[in-house]
A protein has these predicted regions:
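Metal-dependent amide/peptide-bond hydrolase catalytic core
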Residues: 1-140
Length: 140
């Protein structure tokens, strides 16, 4: 960017990390970004889009819902409830889900503030999650 808000810079770089719940939203967003990039904003100004990486959305399949139910039951048998959240994001699980495999992403210890310097792990959940996964494996 420029040296001040009212100065036009020689070069500007914008980096986006986009997340979405379904592939239709990805297409909508991608089309919108490309439309903005194709616009003429000022004489001599050009825009270039470079997509560095991409993962399709991770759909919640019936097979995955069954795994969620089984892991939830395993947690109850171990004496605690597990709270499921739609976390979004991208992992190798997105690729496996796209191939039709059931995927559970995030059965480990509880924590928060992911991917930043405030990220934390709740140590009091480590043992219970090990018990939960062990119980789940014994049930399948």
């Amino acid at each position: 960017g420029g040296s001040a808000p009212n100065v036009i810079s020689e070069k500007c770089v914008v980096k986006l990390d986009t997340r979405y719940w379904n592939n239709e939203d990805d297409k909508y967003l991608d089309d919108g970004i490309n439309k903005l990039a194709a616009a003429v904003w000022a004489p001599g100004v050009t825009q270039t889009i470079e997509r560095v990486s991409h993962s399709n959305a991770m759909p919640l399949s019936d097979a995955t819902k069954e795994l969620v139910a089984q892991i939830t039951e395993a947690a109850k048998l171990e004496g605690f409830d597990i709270d499921w959240v739609d976390a979004g994001g991208a992992s190798d699980g997105n690729h496996m889900a796209e191939a039709g495999l059931p995927v559970i992403d995030g059965c480990g210890p509880a924590g928060g503030e992911f991917h930043c310097d405030r990220e934390f792990l709740r140590l009091d959940t480590v043992e219970e999650r090990i018990r939960m996964i062990t119980r789940f494996l014994s049930l399948i």
